[in-house]
């Protein structure tokens, strides 16, 4: 297919138009007085959002060169979202500023390769300084502040802080759509997996249709149980103890299931059977997790263990087990705390090593189930449009909170970038064009605060000068239009988000400046449809 070519200044300017179109759309959402953007959807109602990466993903431009520029900046937002989960608008804005300032210098004859070296030096110094002013997150209040700033909603901040307090920093917090109007928090303590009882006759509470077992024994196996003779020896031992039993197996069928149900209905003894969670290798790992949590042993053929030889000391134990139609929750497993700790360390190591997002998510879920539990934030709203917007805000706030716990917090509202300018300005280089790269970053670091001020309807330059001349940590509260100590006022950003936004913006922008030619496909014009009846002469 034939291609179009553009060179030098012409190519860079065309791509810059695309960068500006995308960044100008995204940056209106920045700060407490930022607005929303409406995204048209092929199916369903339009999406109203202030999430930078969601907006960037929707933008495709008609002109191929402009689109190239837009796609490069889209990568900045996407990468920042992947690493930190928030800060995508800031990253896009910084990329636009670095490209704009950089192109001015390249047009004036500066060498883009040397400018790139200066940009890298300045960014490394800025990141080093950001880490110096970072403070660790201390307690529930700090977590609530980070989430509230990210979502621009104090109620959401409190909700996320409650969730993290209940399940711990390692716990899993999921976000679901609620059937009601309100947003609420639902916490499941202990190990939960999505398998319910194999027969409704096993339920102990017929009104709620769930089985609750107090201090039960737990038999864990990866085998199918069809013949009651296989588990008869262990059942006899349990009946003598007067305890209840939970069986987790690949399947329970036929005679075995019938016998268990009949004994339950007669009141001889209570036993609930559930299918093992997961599939394939993941199932083996999950069964091992349950065994370690409850202090039991997995009865597996490959380990040479037979169901007929099972003794009481091979069974797991827990304070209570609750089984519904779809879920099983094991609360306070009586496993050895040291073994549980070792298992958690092992899963953490696997998370570090894996490159698959799906595997990482599943490992994180397993980690949470061992470490504390799962919290579900159920998001409610009056309309579907509001629900989607609210859900995106909560997702961003949750990501920001996790980032804050990981690397700490810095003064928010663009203040951290202003605070590091002094140190970056002191960098020097013998090469003039490298010096220009440093100056480009110095100028670009002002941009987030300038945009926050602009979105609040005030002149950014005045605000920037005032913050520069104030002590470190003092910034501009755009919501109330006054200068405050940002951390004391609860206006904070996660260090990881602030750092990632700058690093990703500089990475793509510095490479953008080195462009000398652009190659694009010639757009194909669709041939016009022939008029009806053409070429059909003489036909009736």
Swiss-Prot record:
It is found in: Cytoplasm. It comes from Clostridium botulinum (strain Alaska E43 / Type E3). Together with its co-chaperonin GroES, plays an essential role in assisting protein folding. The GroEL-GroES system forms a nano-cage that allows encapsulation of the non-native substrate proteins and provides a physical environment optimized to promote and accelerate protein folding. It is an enzyme of class 5 (isomerase). SUPFAM superfamilies: GroEL apical domain-like, GroEL equatorial domain-like, GroEL-intermediate domain like. Pfam families: Cpn60_TCP1 (PF00118). This is Chaperonin GroEL. It comes from the Bacteria. GO terms for biological process: protein refolding. GO terms for molecular function: ATP binding; ATP-dependent protein folding chaperone; isomerase activity; unfolded protein binding. Gene3D superfamilies: GroEL, GroEL-like equatorial domain, TCP-1-like chaperonin intermediate domain. ATP binds at residues 29-32, 86-90, 413, 477-479, 493. Its main location: cytoplasm. Forms a cylinder of 14 subunits composed of two heptameric rings stacked back-to-back. Interacts with the co-chaperonin GroES. It catalyses: ATP + H2O + a folded polypeptide = ADP + phosphate + an unfolded polypeptide. Its EC number is 5.6.1.7. Belongs to the chaperonin (HSP60) family. Keywords: ATP-binding, Chaperone, Cytoplasm, Isomerase, Nucleotide-binding. GO terms for cellular component: cytoplasm. PROSITE patterns: CHAPERONINS_CPN60. InterPro entries: Chaperonin_Cpn60_CS (IPR018370), Cpn60/GroEL (IPR001844), Cpn60/GroEL/TCP-1 (IPR002423), GroEL-like_apical_dom_sf (IPR027409), GROEL-like_equatorial_sf (IPR027413), TCP-1-like_intermed_sf (IPR027410).
């Amino acid at each position: 297919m034939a291609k179009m070519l553009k060179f030098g200044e012409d190519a860079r300017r065309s791509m810059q138009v695309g960068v500006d179109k995308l960044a100008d759309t995204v940056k209106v959402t920045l700060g407490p007085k930022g607005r929303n953007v409406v995204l048209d959807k092929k199916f369903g109602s339009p999406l109203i959002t202030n999430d930078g990466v969601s907006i960037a993903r929707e933008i495709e431009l008609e002109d191929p060169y402009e689109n190239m520029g837009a796609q490069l900046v889209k990568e900045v937002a996407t990468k920042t979202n992947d690493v930190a989960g928030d800060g995508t608008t800031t990253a896009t804005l910084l990329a636009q500023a670095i490209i704009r300032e950089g192109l001015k210098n390249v047009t004036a004859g500066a060498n883009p390769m040397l400018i790139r070296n200066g940009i890298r030096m300045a960014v490394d110094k800025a990141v080093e300084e950001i880490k110096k002013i970072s403070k660790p997150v201390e307690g529930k209040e700090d977590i609530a502040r980070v989430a509230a700033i990210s979502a621009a909603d104090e109620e959401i901040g409190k909700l996320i802080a409650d969730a993290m307090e209940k399940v711990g920093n390692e716990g899993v917090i999921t976000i679901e759509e609620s059937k009601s109007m309100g947003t609420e928090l639902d916490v499941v303590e202990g190990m939960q997996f999505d398998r319910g009882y194999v027969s409704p006759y096993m339920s102990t509470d017929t009104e709620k249709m769930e089985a609750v077992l107090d201090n039960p024994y737990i038999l864990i196996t990866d085998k199918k149980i069809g013949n009651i003779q296989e588990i008869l020896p262990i059942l006899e031992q349990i009946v003598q103890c007067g305890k209840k039993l939970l069986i987790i197996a690949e399947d329970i069928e036929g005679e075995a299931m019938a016998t268990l149900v009949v004994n339950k209905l007669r009141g001889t003894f209570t036993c609930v059977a559930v299918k093992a969670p997961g599939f394939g290798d993941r199932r083996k790992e999950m069964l091992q997790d349950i065994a370690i949590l409850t202090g039991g042993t997995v009865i597996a053929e490959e380990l040479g263990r037979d169901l007929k030889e099972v003794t009481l000391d091979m069974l797991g134990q827990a304070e209570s087990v609750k089984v519904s139609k779809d879920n099983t929750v094991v609360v306070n497993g009586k496993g050895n705390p040291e073994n549980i700790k070792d298992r958690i360390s092992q899963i953490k190591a696997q998370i570090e090593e894996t490159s698959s997002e799906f595997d990482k998510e599943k490992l994180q879920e397993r980690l949470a189930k061992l470490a504390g539990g799962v919290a579900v934030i159920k998001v409610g709203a009056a309309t579907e449009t509001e629900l989607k917007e609210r859900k995106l805000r909560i997702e961003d706030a949750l990501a920001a909170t996790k980032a804050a716990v990981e690397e700490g917090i810095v003064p928010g509202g663009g203040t951290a970038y202003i605070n590091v300018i002094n140190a970056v300005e002191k960098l020097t280089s013998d090469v003039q064009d490298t010096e220009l790269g440093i100056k480009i970053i110095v100028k670009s670091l002002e941009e987030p605060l300038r945009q926050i001020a602009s979105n609040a309807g005030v002149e950014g330059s005045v605000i920037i000068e005032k913050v520069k001349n104030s002590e470190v940590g003092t910034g501009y509260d755009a919501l109330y239009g006054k200068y405050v100590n940002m951390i004391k006022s609860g206006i904070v950003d996660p260090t990881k988000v602030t750092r990632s936004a700058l690093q990703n913006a500089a990475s793509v922008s510095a490479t953008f400046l080195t462009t000398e030619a652009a190659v694009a496909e010639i757009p194909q014009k669709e041939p016009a449809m022939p008029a009806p009846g053409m070429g059909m002469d003489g036909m009736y």
